[in-house]
Amino acid sequence: MKTIVLIACVKEKQSNPCKAIDLYQGKDFTNWVSYSKKINADKIYILSGKHGLLNPDEIIEPYDFNLNNANKEYKKKWSDLVLFKLSKETNLKKDNYILLCNDIYAENLLSQIKNYSFPFKIK
């Protein structure tokens, strides 16, 4: 069983294309990355409202989109894409998932992820 951390994107971003782990600049995001490293997570992914599931080293351009404001259909398609990608790289039934995101990012993921926790209350 591996420890997988899913970190939500944040509004504050670099102004140029760069690695996803470097794109997001908010204090919360940097604290969540530090926490993920402190607990020795086996894998860290970023939940992007626009791009779905991102590997930290993926190069992406800055964008302005918030999943919290998306309609129900978009959120369902988004979560299906995230779960599909996760199922290719992790074990949805056995791995332990630590979610560093709000309920909106998590709501459609939890039906398929069996072992999960929310160590922090995130709005």
Task: Annotate each PLM feature.
Residues 1-123:
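Peripheral peptide segments
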